[in-house]
């Protein structure tokens, strides 16, 4: 189960670039053809074969499911896969060294040194892949809510180079192991027979194990993808329900504010009318008094003008 999980987690890296690579021109990947040439049935080689199969499957997943993979658990599972792969590779190397006793010590030391270097390169490639995933997850979280198209394109370019380098180093490691086996044949026929007797059951066991993993891997992964899809749909529905509830609350608050504003406007109108009536009660007596005074003044002026206009009596009479 750990190998299955780890294979899915590693292959997700290429799945992140599926959307970007659909836009650019499709180019043939020669590494897939090389893969078929060097696979000979060893356990670590079969694991790499499943890696490429899962790679194509993960590319069919939706972006939502791919984003679900961007979690700390993914990094932990990927680290577990790397440790398990290197452990099996070291165990296989130890078995070969035990069976190569007829080979000269100098030849064994040289072959062992070359094999360790190839093994270290393969481990560094896997660590680089894990580091790219961690870096990508951090950048995606930092760019939350923004466009990640440029980030996906850059990651796609890095992952393509890493896939080629990983396959190249795995091919080199397979060749080193082949040299080990050739050295056993050159050493003694007895050693070769012992190696074949030991490796035969291991190869068959690896093939059976790979077939079992391949038959059981598809269904759990599909069920997990469906479960993720259902979780995403449930989250979307929950967010929609919360949004609707929030809109209803906002509408109620707006209605309350409107009612308060109308009430305050009515109060202001009443206060204005009361103030107007008060002003009228203050100034009406003054206006009436001024009107009376003005009328009296007009009457006096008219009376004065009438008196001055009367004729003066003549002295002749």
From Swiss-Prot:
Heparin binds at residues 162-165, 229-236. Residues 210-290 are annotated as: Lipid-binding and lipoprotein association. One of its GO terms (cellular component) is very-low-density lipoprotein particle. The modification Phosphoserine is found at residue 147. Pfam families: Apolipoprotein. Keywords: Chylomicron, Endosome, Extracellular matrix, Glycoprotein, HDL, Heparin-binding, Lipid transport, Lipid-binding, Oxidation, Phosphoprotein, Repeat, Secreted, Signal, Transport, VLDL. Residues 266-317 are annotated as: Homooligomerization. One of its GO terms (biological process) is neuron projection development. APOE exists as multiple glycosylated and sialylated glycoforms within cells and in plasma. The extent of glycosylation and sialylation are tissue and context specific. Residues 278-290 are annotated as: Specificity for association with VLDL. It is found in: Secreted; Secreted, Extracellular space; Secreted, Extracellular space, Extracellular matrix; Extracellular vesicle. Residues 80-255 are annotated as: 8 X 22 AA approximate tandem repeats. Residues 158-168 are annotated as: LDL and other lipoprotein receptors binding. Sequence repeats lie at residues 80-101, 102-123, 124-145, 146-167, 168-189, 190-211, 212-233, 234-255. Belongs to the apolipoprotein A1/A4/E family. Homotetramer. May interact with ABCA1; functionally associated with ABCA1 in the biogenesis of HDLs. May interact with APP/A4 amyloid-beta peptide; the interaction is extremely stable in vitro but its physiological significance is unclear. May interact with MAPT. May interact with MAP2. In the cerebrospinal fluid, interacts with secreted SORL1. Interacts with PMEL; this allows the loading of PMEL luminal fragment on ILVs to induce fibril nucleation. This is Apolipoprotein E. The lineage of its organism: Eukaryota, Metazoa, Chordata, Craniata, Vertebrata. The gene is APOE.
């Amino acid at each position: 189960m750990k190998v299955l999980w780890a294979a899915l987690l590693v292959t997700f890296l290429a799945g992140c670039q599926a959307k970007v690579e659909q836009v650019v021109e499709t180019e043939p990947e020669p590494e897939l053809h090389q893969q078929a040439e060097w696979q000979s049935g060893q356990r670590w080689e079969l694991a790499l074969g499943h890696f490429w199969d899962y790679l194509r499957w993960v590319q069919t997943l939706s972006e939502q499911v791919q984003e679900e993979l961007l979690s700390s658990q993914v990094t932990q599972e990927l680290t577990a896969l790397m440790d398990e792969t290197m452990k099996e590779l070291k165990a296989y190397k130890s078995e070969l060294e035990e069976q190569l006793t007829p080979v000269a010590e100098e030849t064994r030391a040289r072959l062992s040194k070359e094999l360790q270097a190839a093994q270290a390169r393969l481990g560094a490639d896997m660590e680089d892949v894990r580091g790219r995933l961690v870096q990508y997850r951090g950048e995606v979280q930092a760019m939350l809510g923004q466009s990640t198209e440029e980030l996906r394109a850059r990651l796609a370019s890095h992952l393509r180079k890493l896939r080629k380098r990983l396959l190249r180093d795995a091919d080199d490691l397979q060749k080193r192991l082949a040299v080990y086996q050739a050295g056993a044949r050159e050493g003694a026929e007895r050693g070769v027979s012992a190696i074949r007797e030991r490796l035969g059951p291991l190869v068959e066991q690896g093939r059976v194990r790979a077939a079992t993993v391949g038959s059981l891997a598809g269904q759990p992964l599909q069920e997990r993808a469906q479960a993720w899809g259902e979780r995403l749909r449930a989250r979307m529905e929950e967010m929609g329900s919360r949004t609707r509830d929030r809109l209803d609350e906002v509408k109620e608050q707006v209605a309350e504010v409107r009612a308060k504003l109308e009430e305050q406007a009515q109060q202001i109108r009443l206060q204005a009318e009361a103030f107007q009536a008060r002003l009228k009660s203050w100034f009406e007596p003054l206006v009436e008094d001024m009107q009376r005074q003005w009328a009296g003044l007009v009457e006096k002026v008219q009376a004065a003008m009438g008196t001055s206009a009367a004729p003066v009596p003549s002295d002749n009479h």
